[in-house]
Amino acid sequence: MEACRTTGLVSIFLLFFWLLIPGHIHGQQTSEQEKYHVDSTLFVYYQHCKAAIKSPSVILMLDTLFLMAKDKGDLRMQAVAISSKTDHFYFGPSFEGQEDSLILYTNTIKDFARKTNQPQYYYFAWANRLITYYTKQKKLNLALYEANKMQQESESREEIDGMQNCYQALLRIYQSKELYKQATVYAQKLIDLTLKYNLNKYNLTNKYIELSNCYLRTNESTKAWEALEESKLYIGVTCKVT
């Protein structure tokens, strides 16, 4: 009875802290054009592509964006053009070849990103499009296989983008499998990675709350409270502009 009462109290406090966080810790976004110094013509055309991301016609539009970016010597926008094709097949209507198309363009952006030293696009499409697609489709063993490959690769190369993405993916997979002991491992890894490399702490409160929730699921109320106490240290931390 006491354990149930404690768990209930912690759950109430989790909700309280979610409400306390301004905007639920959404990062303060800056203009992408200003941040990355994107050519105005490219940026305007990219916005048209984004608006049409679910339309079949966007594939040809993104091919055009890629060629425009190539003419400008903008490798980043070339990567964006390819990566956006994974957005199309991820967000667009379901059809028979959807998964194969998503795999194809995930591999395409991975190849381009590796050749041009842009690991953020390499890992983003892999984790947040292909693996997340598998997770949402309940193909959890496939998702776990890909995420484990990503963990091995990113850790061996010491690529922070990859480690962040794969730890987040593995956390979601184990939560979906209701394997909360394993989920706590990756919730903690995300926190440790942020602190070790002094990464942006704007949503570190969220990470501690998620860790606390995982501990609740394993009936470890003391650890849940400890994580919740740690979360309070980062309430109000805003997104830094780099």
State where each predicted segment sits.
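A "functional boundary" signal
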Residues: 25-242
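Bacterial N-terminal signal peptides
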Residues: 11-22
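Bacterial N-terminal signal peptides that target proteins for export
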Residues: 1-13
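Generic short amphipathic/hydrophobic targeting helices enriched at N-termini
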Residues: 6-8, 21, 34
